[in-house]
Amino acid sequence: MLRLVLLLLVTDFAASHETLDSSDSQIMKRSQFRTPDCGHFDFPACPRNLNPVCGTDMNTYSNECTLCMKIREDGSHINIIKDEPC
């Protein structure tokens, strides 16, 4: 019985270690996201140009300024995944 418990613990540890490794690779990918440059926009209005960006919250914003407005309103931390719709 003790051997079975030890075997289950070792198996569980190995599985959690693999999960940790895969989440580490996700963190590396996240560090490659672009931080929006919110300092050069005149709030509360944004230009109406359509230049979509995909945020790390998986929402598409019509341009970088609208993403910055969302960050300003919510205080959330959203980076840009890509310069196109999600």
Swiss-Prot record:
Single Gene Ontology BP annotation: acrosome assembly
Domain Kazal-like, chain residue ranges per copy: 32-86
Gene Ontology terms for molecular function: serine-type endopeptidase inhibitor activity
InterPro entries: Kazal_dom, Kazal_dom_sf, SPINK2
Signal peptide start-end: 1-16
A GO cellular component annotation in the UniProt record: acrosomal vesicle
Organism listed in the record: Mus musculus
Protein name: Serine protease inhibitor Kazal-type 2
Top-level lineage group: Eukaryota
Disruption phenotype: Knockout male mice are completely infertile, whereas no reproductive defects are observed in females. Spermatozoa are completely absent from caudal epididymis, which only contains round cells likely corresponding to round spermatids and multinucleated cells. Seminiferous tubules contain germ cells up to the early round-spermatid stage but condensed and elongated spermatids and mature spermatozoa are completely absent. Round spermatids do not contain an acrosomal vesicle.
Gene name of this polypeptide: Spink2
Site (Reactive bond) residue list: R48, N49
Predominant place of localization: secreted
Tissue expression per record: Expressed in sperm (at protein level). Expressed in testis but not in ovary, brain, heart, kidney or lung. Within testis, expressed in epididymis and germ cells.
Note: On the 2D-gel the determined pI of this protein is: 5, its MW is: 8 kDa.
Compartmental location: Secreted; Cytoplasmic vesicle, Secretory vesicle, Acrosome
SS bonds (residue pairs): C38-C68, C46-C65, C54-C86
Job of this protein: As a strong inhibitor of acrosin, it is required for normal spermiogenesis. It probably hinders premature activation of proacrosin and other proteases, thus preventing the cascade of events leading to spermiogenesis defects. May be involved in the regulation of serine protease-dependent germ cell apoptosis. It also inhibits trypsin.
Keywords from the named record: Apoptosis, Cytoplasmic vesicle, Differentiation, Disulfide bond, Protease inhibitor, Secreted, Serine protease inhibitor, Signal, Spermatogenesis
PROSITE patterns in the cross-refs: KAZAL_1, KAZAL_2
